[in-house]
Amino acid sequence: MTTTNGNGHVAVTTNGHTRPVVTVGVSARDDGNRRPQKTAERVAADIVRDLVAEGLRTGDHLPLEAAMVERYHASRASVREALRLLEVQGLIHLKPGPGGGPVVGQVDPANLARTSTLYFHLSGATYEAVLRAQAALEPICAQLAARHPSRRDAMQRFLVPAGLRTTSEYRRHTEDFHGTVYRLAGNPIMSLLTQAVTRIITDHVVATMDPVELRGAILHEHAALARAIAGGQPETAGRLMAEHLAAQHDYYRRNAPERLTELVEWR
């Protein structure tokens, strides 16, 4: 339950405990007195712009520190801080030893998920709210996927329910299927947001249980979804995805009701 006191401060009550919530939105600095951008932040932004402009990909090397100092007109300390900022976000990693240096990382939704959990926690969001976000986002991705020109070829391998025997096979199939839907959606923002939300559910909620009894139904639902997407039926695809998620969410609510009322953990 969320409450507001006379001073306008927001608090959330979960499992009988009330705690204050940091309001995420307009801050005290939004009155026209924003702090100046730090040199390291400016350098980090320039590095990202150059990374995109030059078409660098995962595993490509960035210039060495000395070259960056000259290129970005910054001190060594500012360049190092900029690289640390990017490393924390998973956008680069620093390879040690000879031939090392900054290397382009992966655009991994797990990094967005991790950062998002901090803001979700501060805003008082529960895991139930994360489920509802997924229920809103993923059917839209399915509808968009059903309009993609490459949908038939991409969905071909999912048209028949997979015969999977092990947990690892099942998880790989599930990640592959939903990942293909996200890619076919053709909207990188929708794709990243949906993948981040789904990653939080997988790592924070599903990890506490193993719904083996749902696997057969889920695999048949994937096949039905694949046929709707491949057949260019966006409304059907959206409806089937909504039903697919609703069945899983109902299972989580029955089997882990306390977990869903908890604040999203930052991790």
Question: Where do the language-model regions lie?
Answer:
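Short linear motifs at protein or domain termini
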Residues: 1-133, 147, 260
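Conserved amphipathic alpha-helical segments that form helical-bundle/coiled-coil interaction surfaces
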Residues: 130-207, 218-226, 236-251
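A broad structural signal for alpha-helix termini and local helix breaks/kinks
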Residues: 72, 185-186, 256
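…primarily DNA-binding HTH/wHTH and HhH modules…
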Residues: 257-267
